[in-house]
Amino acid sequence: MTQVPAPLEIKLHKRSKTLELVYADGQFELTAEFLRVHSPSAEVRGHGIGQEVLQTGKKFVGISGLEASGNYALKIIFDDGHDSGLYTWPYLHDLAHNQATYWQAYLDRLTAAGESRDKGLIALG
């Protein structure tokens, strides 16, 4: 089994709310919303199969900061207060390489649940 390497570069773009990951096999930009709704935390994934919690209303979430967790993961601190997920190098690599598939599956789950990405937000003006 081949070991998934850490990204060669990690860049946080606060204005565009994206995390740029550079690997030997490509460069990827993951939105804060995508990362937030796919957090590996128990708060999102639950403690077992069927206990996942669908994340709604995260369209405008941003990333406040990043912290290395040893040599194996990245802790992402979101501006909605969520900071309990450790994104391991293999998990980030998987998210980057399968972003389109995972995003569509998330949108399908939202639709099936009658929920939305911007739930509870009030449009002004």
Predicted regions and their residues:
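Motif-centric detector for short Cys/His coordination patterns
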Residues: 1-125
